[in-house]
Amino acid sequence: MTGKGCIIELKNVSKIFEDTCALDNINLQIANGEFLTLLGPSGCGKTTILRIISGFETPDVGEILIAGVNVSGFPPERRQVNTVFQHYALFPHMTVRDNVAFGLRMQKCPREKVNELVFEALRMVHLENFADRRPSQLSGGQQQRVAIARAVVNKPLLLLLDEPFSALDHKLRQIMQLEIKHLQRKLGITFVFVTHDQEEAFAMSDRVVVMNQGRIEQIGTPQCIYEEPVNLFVARFVGEINNLAGTILSCNDEGIYEAAIANEVFPLRTPHRFSPGEAVNVLLRPEDIRIYLLDEEVLKVPHLRGRIEETVYKGATVDIIIALDVGGTLRVAEFFNEDDAEISYNEGERVAVTWVDGWEVVLPHEMA
């Protein structure tokens, strides 16, 4: 957690629905002013955490603390927490202004104060000129902004966002990601965001919580999660990964291991401790692998051999699929430069592959 002080804490929280364990002993601290994302596949428990924080669900075991107060038995209206849902839940018969003002009026806020706060909220989301329109007269992105304005107008301690971009197209999602991140920084409110989209999580978050089957697999910065995954599930969920099976042979005085991978011996750098003979997974991101022709200097260093099976042009990058002589394939990503002839590979061409020294992730063996 960052050094800003804890605003939300979940202590030993568990929740069971019928025969399904939705949350299994969750412990999580969220810093004041932090943008934290719960990332994981459908059914992993991330939305259940949101509902428990907001008060729409009650944990079977554990406590929820907001600003140091145990709110486990508090109803939603006493928690100073607002939620933006997937489908916005705007009132179709009300104007934008009235939608944003609804909560303030329910709280008996004075009319002048309501008008002031509503205008401020709409201005922050660039909709001050749309106050008299109805939701049906707005685009999907504009409806999204109205929902966010309504959620922040009363300045809650915490804003929860449950996959709010799911109904938007890819380009609009990217625009909204930047707008939400900027708005959160401006407001200083703690945001807890739920998504199954790794790129979305990485683009917006101070920290990411990767979840699977009701458990937290890893918590860290986007860079830490991507570059230092703690297990195969995390490595695969947050991007493309190549998995090579290896066996530890030895370790020198500098802590560099030697491992047998296929028919070669490779040096491996890792903070983990292994014993000779131990099986490991050597994980490589596609962008960390290098391709060479067989007559190049790479033949003097450890490498694997194979042939080009397929190339996939993606605009900024080209994906190259290599069928290894020892079996299996590697996916390699190279940045595309139309002036660079070296990125042109022919199907069936023989190549050697190695990787950037020290960029491998070495983990205890798990079944693939």
From Swiss-Prot:
ATP binds at G40, P41, S42, G43, C44, G45, K46, T47. It holds the Pfam family ABC_tran. GO terms for molecular function: ABC-type putrescine transporter activity; ATP binding; ATP hydrolysis activity. Signal peptide: none annotated. It is a peripheral membrane protein. Belongs to the ABC transporter superfamily. Spermidine/putrescine importer (TC 3.A.1.11.1) family. Part of the ABC transporter complex PotABCD involved in spermidine/putrescine import. Responsible for energy coupling to the transport system. NCBIfam families: potA, PRK09452.1. This is Spermidine/putrescine import ATP-binding protein PotA.
